[in-house]
Amino acid sequence: MRQLCRGRVLGISVAIAHGVFSGSLNILLKFLISRYQFSFLTLVQCLTSSTAALSLELLRRLGLIAVPPFGLSLARSFAGVAVLSTLQSSLTLWSLRGLSLPMYVVFKRCLPLVTMLIGVLVLKNGAPSPGVLAAVLITTCGAALAGAGDLTGDPIGYVTGVLAVLVHAAYLVLIQKASADTEHGPLTAQYVIAVSATPLLVICSFASTDSIHAWTFPGWKDPAMVSIFVACILIGCAMNFTTLHCTYINSAVTTSFVGVVKSIATITVGMVAFSDVEPTSLFIAGVVVNTLGSIIYCVAKFLETRRQSNYEDLESQAEGEERQPSGDQLPFVMEELPAKSGNSEPESAEGAGDSVQQGGQESRGSIRGISLAARSSRAEGHSDEVGRRSLKDTYLEVWRLVRGTKYMKKDYLMENEALPSP
Protein backbone atom coordinates (compact mmCIF):
# COMPACT_ATOMS: atom_id res chain seq x y z
CA MET A 1 0.00 0.00 0.00
CA ARG A 2 2.84 2.36 0.86
CA GLN A 3 4.56 1.62 -2.45
CA LEU A 4 1.32 2.32 -4.33
CA CYS A 5 0.90 5.69 -2.60
CA ARG A 6 4.52 6.54 -3.32
CA GLY A 7 4.02 5.78 -7.01
CA ARG A 8 0.93 7.98 -7.17
CA VAL A 9 2.71 10.85 -5.43
CA LEU A 10 5.63 10.53 -7.86
CA GLY A 11 3.30 10.58 -10.87
CA ILE A 12 1.46 13.67 -9.62
CA SER A 13 4.71 15.45 -8.71
CA VAL A 14 6.24 14.83 -12.13
CA ALA A 15 3.04 16.03 -13.84
CA ILE A 16 3.03 19.25 -11.79
CA ALA A 17 6.73 19.83 -12.51
CA HIS A 18 6.11 19.31 -16.22
CA GLY A 19 3.29 21.86 -16.16
CA VAL A 20 5.40 24.43 -14.31
CA PHE A 21 8.43 24.07 -16.59
CA SER A 22 6.36 24.02 -19.78
CA GLY A 23 4.33 27.11 -18.86
CA SER A 24 7.41 29.01 -17.71
CA LEU A 25 9.27 28.19 -20.91
CA ASN A 26 6.38 29.38 -23.10
CA ILE A 27 6.15 32.69 -21.25
CA LEU A 28 9.92 33.34 -21.30
CA LEU A 29 10.24 32.48 -24.98
CA LYS A 30 7.38 34.83 -25.78
CA PHE A 31 9.19 37.53 -23.78
CA LEU A 32 12.31 37.02 -25.88
CA ILE A 33 10.38 37.11 -29.14
CA SER A 34 7.96 39.97 -28.37
CA ARG A 35 9.86 42.28 -26.05
CA TYR A 36 13.42 41.87 -27.30
CA GLN A 37 12.71 40.87 -30.93
CA PHE A 38 14.95 37.84 -30.51
CA SER A 39 14.49 35.75 -33.65
CA PHE A 40 17.37 33.26 -33.38
CA LEU A 41 15.18 30.31 -32.40
CA THR A 42 17.37 27.62 -33.95
CA LEU A 43 20.21 28.78 -31.71
CA VAL A 44 17.99 28.37 -28.64
CA GLN A 45 17.08 24.86 -29.70
CA CYS A 46 20.71 23.95 -30.46
CA LEU A 47 22.02 25.26 -27.14
CA THR A 48 19.26 23.47 -25.20
CA SER A 49 20.09 20.12 -26.79
CA SER A 50 23.87 20.53 -26.48
CA THR A 51 23.58 21.62 -22.83
CA ALA A 52 21.55 18.51 -22.00
CA ALA A 53 23.94 16.24 -23.91
CA LEU A 54 27.11 17.64 -22.29
CA SER A 55 25.61 17.70 -18.79
CA LEU A 56 24.35 14.12 -18.93
CA GLU A 57 27.61 12.87 -20.47
CA LEU A 58 29.60 14.54 -17.69
CA LEU A 59 27.33 13.10 -15.00
CA ARG A 60 27.59 9.65 -16.59
CA ARG A 61 31.39 9.74 -16.66
CA LEU A 62 31.47 10.85 -13.03
CA GLY A 63 29.23 7.92 -12.10
CA LEU A 64 26.46 10.11 -10.71
CA ILE A 65 23.76 8.72 -13.01
CA ALA A 66 23.18 5.15 -14.23
CA VAL A 67 23.05 5.71 -17.98
CA PRO A 68 24.59 3.32 -20.54
CA PRO A 69 27.18 4.76 -22.95
CA PHE A 70 25.93 6.04 -26.27
CA GLY A 71 26.04 3.53 -29.10
CA LEU A 72 24.38 2.61 -32.37
CA SER A 73 22.05 0.05 -30.79
CA LEU A 74 20.95 2.57 -28.18
CA ALA A 75 20.48 5.27 -30.80
CA ARG A 76 18.44 2.90 -32.95
CA SER A 77 16.02 2.27 -30.08
CA PHE A 78 15.19 5.99 -29.76
CA ALA A 79 15.70 7.11 -33.37
CA GLY A 80 12.04 7.92 -34.00
CA VAL A 81 11.68 9.71 -30.67
CA ALA A 82 14.78 11.82 -31.37
CA VAL A 83 13.54 12.88 -34.82
CA LEU A 84 10.07 13.82 -33.56
CA SER A 85 11.53 15.63 -30.54
CA THR A 86 13.68 17.83 -32.76
CA LEU A 87 10.85 18.50 -35.20
CA GLN A 88 8.37 19.22 -32.42
CA SER A 89 10.57 21.78 -30.69
CA SER A 90 11.27 23.52 -34.01
CA LEU A 91 7.57 23.77 -34.89
CA THR A 92 6.76 24.99 -31.38
CA LEU A 93 9.26 27.85 -31.64
CA TRP A 94 8.00 28.86 -35.08
CA SER A 95 4.35 28.79 -33.97
CA LEU A 96 5.23 30.96 -30.95
CA ARG A 97 6.73 33.48 -33.36
CA GLY A 98 3.61 33.70 -35.55
CA LEU A 99 0.85 33.31 -32.95
CA SER A 100 -0.15 35.17 -29.84
CA LEU A 101 0.53 33.30 -26.62
CA PRO A 102 -3.15 32.66 -25.77
CA MET A 103 -3.81 31.48 -29.33
CA TYR A 104 -0.78 29.19 -29.18
CA VAL A 105 -2.21 27.73 -25.97
CA VAL A 106 -5.56 27.19 -27.70
CA PHE A 107 -3.81 25.12 -30.36
CA LYS A 108 -2.03 23.11 -27.71
CA ARG A 109 -5.37 22.36 -26.05
CA CYS A 110 -6.28 20.23 -29.05
CA LEU A 111 -3.33 17.98 -28.17
CA PRO A 112 -5.28 15.46 -26.00
CA LEU A 113 -7.67 14.56 -28.83
CA VAL A 114 -4.89 14.05 -31.37
CA THR A 115 -2.81 12.11 -28.83
CA MET A 116 -5.74 9.84 -28.00
CA LEU A 117 -6.45 9.10 -31.66
CA ILE A 118 -2.82 8.38 -32.53
CA GLY A 119 -2.44 6.30 -29.36
CA VAL A 120 -5.39 4.09 -30.29
CA LEU A 121 -3.92 3.53 -33.76
CA VAL A 122 -0.28 3.00 -32.75
CA LEU A 123 -0.42 1.46 -29.27
CA LYS A 124 -3.57 -0.60 -29.99
CA ASN A 125 -4.47 -0.70 -26.31
CA GLY A 126 -8.20 -0.40 -26.82
CA ALA A 127 -10.61 2.49 -26.81
CA PRO A 128 -10.47 4.95 -23.88
CA SER A 129 -13.08 4.96 -21.16
CA PRO A 130 -16.27 7.02 -21.64
CA GLY A 131 -15.12 9.56 -19.03
CA VAL A 132 -11.78 10.17 -20.74
CA LEU A 133 -13.45 10.36 -24.15
CA ALA A 134 -16.00 12.91 -22.92
CA ALA A 135 -13.26 15.02 -21.29
CA VAL A 136 -11.18 15.05 -24.48
CA LEU A 137 -14.13 16.05 -26.66
CA ILE A 138 -15.21 18.83 -24.28
CA THR A 139 -11.65 20.16 -24.11
CA THR A 140 -11.35 20.20 -27.90
CA CYS A 141 -14.70 21.98 -28.28
CA GLY A 142 -13.53 24.61 -25.81
CA ALA A 143 -10.33 25.10 -27.80
CA ALA A 144 -12.31 25.58 -31.02
CA LEU A 145 -14.65 28.03 -29.28
CA ALA A 146 -11.74 30.06 -27.91
CA GLY A 147 -9.94 29.99 -31.25
CA ALA A 148 -12.93 31.50 -33.00
CA GLY A 149 -12.30 34.69 -31.03
CA ASP A 150 -8.86 35.29 -32.52
CA LEU A 151 -8.26 34.87 -36.25
CA THR A 152 -5.79 37.73 -36.64
CA GLY A 153 -2.53 35.81 -36.40
CA ASP A 154 0.06 35.03 -39.04
CA PRO A 155 -1.11 32.29 -41.47
CA ILE A 156 2.29 30.61 -41.19
CA GLY A 157 1.82 30.63 -37.42
CA TYR A 158 -1.49 28.79 -37.77
CA VAL A 159 0.05 26.20 -40.10
CA THR A 160 3.02 25.61 -37.82
CA GLY A 161 0.63 25.48 -34.84
CA VAL A 162 -1.38 22.66 -36.42
CA LEU A 163 1.79 20.80 -37.40
CA ALA A 164 3.22 21.29 -33.91
CA VAL A 165 0.13 19.66 -32.38
CA LEU A 166 0.30 16.68 -34.74
CA VAL A 167 4.04 16.12 -34.27
CA HIS A 168 3.83 16.66 -30.49
CA ALA A 169 1.06 14.06 -30.20
CA ALA A 170 3.06 11.54 -32.25
CA TYR A 171 6.13 12.32 -30.11
CA LEU A 172 4.26 11.57 -26.85
CA VAL A 173 2.77 8.35 -28.21
CA LEU A 174 6.17 7.20 -29.44
CA ILE A 175 7.66 7.90 -26.00
CA GLN A 176 5.01 5.71 -24.39
CA LYS A 177 5.67 2.96 -26.95
CA ALA A 178 9.44 3.18 -26.32
CA SER A 179 8.88 2.91 -22.56
CA ALA A 180 7.01 -0.36 -23.13
CA ASP A 181 9.38 -1.79 -25.75
CA THR A 182 12.72 -0.96 -24.09
CA GLU A 183 14.08 -1.38 -20.60
CA HIS A 184 15.66 2.08 -20.44
CA GLY A 185 14.31 4.90 -18.31
CA PRO A 186 13.46 8.52 -19.13
CA LEU A 187 16.94 9.79 -18.25
CA THR A 188 18.51 7.42 -20.77
CA ALA A 189 15.95 8.51 -23.34
CA GLN A 190 16.81 12.18 -22.84
CA TYR A 191 20.53 11.40 -23.03
CA VAL A 192 20.14 9.52 -26.33
CA ILE A 193 17.82 12.16 -27.82
CA ALA A 194 20.15 15.03 -26.86
CA VAL A 195 23.30 13.33 -28.17
CA SER A 196 21.57 12.28 -31.40
CA ALA A 197 19.94 15.65 -32.10
CA THR A 198 22.85 17.96 -31.22
CA PRO A 199 24.95 17.44 -34.41
CA LEU A 200 21.90 17.99 -36.63
CA LEU A 201 20.88 21.12 -34.72
CA VAL A 202 24.40 22.55 -34.94
CA ILE A 203 24.29 22.13 -38.72
CA CYS A 204 20.82 23.71 -38.88
CA SER A 205 21.88 26.66 -36.73
CA PHE A 206 24.77 27.44 -39.08
CA ALA A 207 22.67 26.79 -42.19
CA SER A 208 20.04 29.27 -40.98
CA THR A 209 22.84 31.75 -40.09
CA ASP A 210 21.47 32.01 -36.53
CA SER A 211 24.81 31.04 -35.03
CA ILE A 212 26.55 33.66 -37.20
CA HIS A 213 24.30 36.70 -36.79
CA ALA A 214 23.20 36.05 -33.20
CA TRP A 215 26.38 37.50 -31.73
CA THR A 216 25.69 40.89 -33.31
CA PHE A 217 22.33 41.08 -31.54
CA PRO A 218 22.23 44.28 -29.44
CA GLY A 219 20.16 42.69 -26.69
CA TRP A 220 23.21 40.89 -25.24
CA LYS A 221 24.07 44.14 -23.47
CA ASP A 222 20.87 43.89 -21.40
CA PRO A 223 21.41 41.69 -18.30
CA ALA A 224 17.69 40.92 -18.07
CA MET A 225 17.63 39.63 -21.61
CA VAL A 226 20.72 37.47 -21.01
CA SER A 227 19.14 36.08 -17.82
CA ILE A 228 15.93 35.20 -19.67
CA PHE A 229 17.94 33.57 -22.46
CA VAL A 230 19.94 31.41 -20.02
CA ALA A 231 16.74 30.55 -18.12
CA CYS A 232 15.14 29.40 -21.38
CA ILE A 233 18.06 27.05 -22.02
CA LEU A 234 17.99 25.51 -18.53
CA ILE A 235 14.20 25.29 -18.26
CA GLY A 236 14.10 23.74 -21.72
CA CYS A 237 16.37 20.92 -20.52
CA ALA A 238 14.21 20.38 -17.43
CA MET A 239 11.00 20.46 -19.46
CA ASN A 240 12.28 17.82 -21.89
CA PHE A 241 13.11 15.49 -19.01
CA THR A 242 9.77 16.00 -17.26
CA THR A 243 7.97 15.38 -20.55
CA LEU A 244 9.69 12.02 -20.88
CA HIS A 245 9.30 11.16 -17.20
CA CYS A 246 5.60 12.09 -17.08
CA THR A 247 4.86 10.03 -20.18
CA TYR A 248 6.82 7.06 -18.81
CA ILE A 249 5.03 7.10 -15.44
CA ASN A 250 1.54 8.19 -16.49
CA SER A 251 0.60 8.14 -20.18
CA ALA A 252 0.78 10.23 -23.34
CA VAL A 253 -2.79 11.53 -22.91
CA THR A 254 -2.12 12.52 -19.29
CA THR A 255 0.98 14.45 -20.33
CA SER A 256 -1.02 16.29 -22.97
CA PHE A 257 -3.71 17.15 -20.41
CA VAL A 258 -1.08 18.60 -18.08
CA GLY A 259 -0.54 21.24 -20.76
CA VAL A 260 -4.26 21.97 -20.73
CA VAL A 261 -4.28 22.52 -16.97
CA LYS A 262 -1.22 24.80 -16.92
CA SER A 263 -2.51 26.81 -19.86
CA ILE A 264 -4.93 28.72 -17.61
CA ALA A 265 -2.02 30.54 -16.00
CA THR A 266 -0.30 30.91 -19.37
CA ILE A 267 -3.35 32.56 -20.93
CA THR A 268 -3.69 34.93 -17.98
CA VAL A 269 -0.05 35.98 -18.18
CA GLY A 270 -0.27 36.32 -21.97
CA MET A 271 -3.26 38.65 -21.81
CA VAL A 272 -1.82 40.78 -19.02
CA ALA A 273 1.82 40.95 -20.09
CA PHE A 274 1.61 41.09 -23.88
CA SER A 275 -1.85 42.59 -24.58
CA ASP A 276 -1.91 40.98 -28.02
CA VAL A 277 -5.31 39.35 -27.51
CA GLU A 278 -8.38 41.07 -26.10
CA PRO A 279 -10.37 38.84 -23.72
CA THR A 280 -13.57 38.57 -25.76
CA SER A 281 -16.63 36.79 -24.43
CA LEU A 282 -16.18 33.98 -26.96
CA PHE A 283 -12.58 33.47 -25.91
CA ILE A 284 -13.48 33.40 -22.20
CA ALA A 285 -16.32 30.92 -22.87
CA GLY A 286 -13.87 28.64 -24.67
CA VAL A 287 -11.43 28.79 -21.77
CA VAL A 288 -14.22 27.90 -19.32
CA VAL A 289 -15.30 24.90 -21.42
CA ASN A 290 -11.67 23.86 -21.70
CA THR A 291 -11.23 24.00 -17.95
CA LEU A 292 -14.40 21.94 -17.46
CA GLY A 293 -12.99 19.26 -19.75
CA SER A 294 -9.76 19.21 -17.74
CA ILE A 295 -11.67 18.71 -14.49
CA ILE A 296 -13.71 15.88 -16.00
CA TYR A 297 -10.49 14.22 -17.17
CA CYS A 298 -8.93 14.41 -13.71
CA VAL A 299 -12.03 12.84 -12.13
CA ALA A 300 -12.20 10.10 -14.79
CA LYS A 301 -8.51 9.22 -14.38
CA PHE A 302 -8.89 9.15 -10.59
CA LEU A 303 -11.79 6.69 -10.84
CA GLU A 304 -9.84 4.56 -13.33
CA THR A 305 -6.79 4.49 -11.06
CA ARG A 306 -8.83 3.51 -8.02
CA ARG A 307 -10.63 0.77 -9.97
CA GLN A 308 -7.33 -0.55 -11.28
CA SER A 309 -5.74 -0.56 -7.82
CA ASN A 310 -8.70 -2.51 -6.41
CA TYR A 311 -8.38 -5.04 -9.21
CA GLU A 312 -4.63 -5.40 -8.59
CA ASP A 313 -5.28 -5.96 -4.88
CA LEU A 314 -7.71 -8.78 -5.69
CA GLU A 315 -5.20 -10.27 -8.13
CA SER A 316 -2.35 -10.20 -5.60
CA GLN A 317 -4.60 -11.71 -2.92
CA ALA A 318 -5.62 -14.55 -5.23
CA GLU A 319 -2.00 -15.18 -6.24
CA GLY A 320 -0.95 -15.25 -2.58
CA GLU A 321 -3.53 -17.89 -1.78
CA GLU A 322 -2.57 -19.87 -4.88
CA ARG A 323 1.10 -19.94 -3.90
CA GLN A 324 0.37 -21.63 -0.57
CA PRO A 325 -2.46 -24.09 -1.23
CA SER A 326 -1.35 -26.40 1.60
CA GLY A 327 -0.68 -23.65 4.11
CA ASP A 328 -4.27 -23.15 5.29
CA GLN A 329 -4.77 -22.99 9.02
CA LEU A 330 -6.54 -26.13 10.11
CA PRO A 331 -9.13 -25.93 12.93
CA PHE A 332 -7.44 -28.83 14.75
CA VAL A 333 -4.20 -30.81 14.64
CA MET A 334 -4.41 -33.96 12.55
CA GLU A 335 -3.35 -37.14 14.24
CA GLU A 336 -0.95 -39.51 12.55
CA LEU A 337 -2.34 -42.79 11.28
CA PRO A 338 -1.26 -45.89 13.22
CA ALA A 339 1.24 -48.12 11.47
CA LYS A 340 -0.26 -51.09 9.63
CA SER A 341 1.26 -54.43 10.71
CA GLY A 342 -1.02 -56.84 8.84
CA ASN A 343 1.48 -57.62 6.11
CA SER A 344 4.44 -58.29 8.40
CA GLU A 345 3.13 -61.54 9.94
CA PRO A 346 2.67 -63.49 6.70
CA GLU A 347 6.05 -62.35 5.45
CA SER A 348 7.79 -63.42 8.68
CA ALA A 349 5.97 -66.76 8.60
CA GLU A 350 7.05 -67.24 5.02
CA GLY A 351 10.63 -66.51 6.03
CA ALA A 352 10.44 -69.11 8.86
CA GLY A 353 9.07 -71.76 6.46
CA ASP A 354 11.93 -71.14 4.08
CA SER A 355 14.46 -71.61 6.90
CA VAL A 356 12.89 -75.00 7.93
CA GLN A 357 12.76 -76.31 4.35
CA GLN A 358 16.38 -75.24 3.68
CA GLY A 359 17.94 -76.43 6.90
CA GLY A 360 21.39 -76.82 5.40
CA GLN A 361 21.45 -73.22 4.02
CA GLU A 362 21.00 -71.10 7.15
CA SER A 363 23.17 -68.25 6.00
CA ARG A 364 21.25 -67.87 2.71
CA GLY A 365 17.92 -68.07 4.55
CA SER A 366 19.01 -65.40 7.03
CA ILE A 367 20.04 -63.02 4.22
CA ARG A 368 16.72 -63.59 2.43
CA GLY A 369 14.85 -62.94 5.66
CA ILE A 370 16.68 -59.65 6.15
CA SER A 371 15.89 -58.51 2.58
CA LEU A 372 12.23 -59.48 2.95
CA ALA A 373 12.00 -57.59 6.23
CA ALA A 374 13.57 -54.46 4.69
CA ARG A 375 11.22 -54.69 1.71
CA SER A 376 8.18 -55.04 3.94
CA SER A 377 9.24 -52.05 6.06
CA ARG A 378 9.69 -49.89 2.94
CA ALA A 379 6.29 -50.90 1.57
CA GLU A 380 4.77 -50.28 4.96
CA GLY A 381 6.30 -46.78 5.22
CA HIS A 382 5.25 -45.92 1.67
CA SER A 383 1.64 -46.98 2.22
CA ASP A 384 1.61 -45.07 5.52
CA GLU A 385 2.87 -41.89 3.81
CA VAL A 386 0.39 -42.22 0.92
CA GLY A 387 -2.45 -42.71 3.38
CA ARG A 388 -1.54 -39.61 5.41
CA ARG A 389 -1.11 -37.48 2.27
CA SER A 390 -4.41 -38.55 0.70
CA LEU A 391 -6.28 -37.95 3.96
CA LYS A 392 -4.75 -34.50 4.38
CA ASP A 393 -5.46 -33.53 0.75
CA THR A 394 -9.05 -34.71 1.07
CA TYR A 395 -9.52 -32.72 4.25
CA LEU A 396 -8.02 -29.56 2.72
CA GLU A 397 -10.32 -29.82 -0.28
CA VAL A 398 -13.38 -30.10 1.94
CA TRP A 399 -12.13 -27.27 4.17
CA ARG A 400 -11.67 -24.90 1.18
CA LEU A 401 -15.23 -25.57 0.09
CA VAL A 402 -16.52 -24.85 3.59
CA ARG A 403 -14.52 -21.62 3.93
CA GLY A 404 -16.90 -19.78 1.65
CA THR A 405 -16.60 -17.10 -0.99
CA LYS A 406 -12.92 -17.11 -2.04
CA TYR A 407 -12.53 -18.79 -5.40
CA MET A 408 -9.21 -19.89 -6.80
CA LYS A 409 -7.98 -19.94 -10.38
CA LYS A 410 -7.35 -23.70 -10.06
CA ASP A 411 -10.02 -26.22 -9.14
CA TYR A 412 -8.27 -28.71 -6.89
CA LEU A 413 -11.29 -31.04 -6.79
CA MET A 414 -11.18 -31.44 -10.55
CA GLU A 415 -7.42 -32.03 -10.42
CA ASN A 416 -7.65 -34.92 -7.97
CA GLU A 417 -10.89 -36.42 -9.28
CA ALA A 418 -10.42 -39.96 -10.61
CA LEU A 419 -11.44 -40.39 -14.20
CA PRO A 420 -13.89 -43.28 -14.90
CA SER A 421 -12.37 -46.22 -16.71
CA PRO A 422 -13.66 -46.71 -20.26
UniProtKB/Swiss-Prot annotation:
Annotated stretches, region: Disordered: 339-365
Function, as annotated: Probable UDP-glucose transmembrane transporter involved in UDP-glucose transport from the cytosol to the lumen of synaptic vesicles. It is involved in platelet dense granules maturation.
Entry GO MF terms: protein-macromolecule adaptor activity; UDP-glucose transmembrane transporter activity
Lineage: Eukaryota, Metazoa, Chordata, Craniata, Vertebrata
Residue ranges of the TM segments: 9-29, 38-58, 64-84, 103-123, 131-151, 155-175, 187-207, 224-244, 257-277, 280-300
InterPro entries, A to Z: TPT_transporter
Biased composition (Polar residues): 355-364
Family label: Belongs to the TPT transporter family. SLC35D subfamily.
Protein name: Solute carrier family 35 member D3
Provenance organism: Mus musculus (Mouse)
Main location: membrane
Disruption phenotype: Mice lacking Slc35d3 display decreased concentrations of serotonin in platelet-dense granules and altered hemostasis. Mice also show a loss of dopaminergic neurons and exhibit metabolic syndrome and lowered energy expenditure.
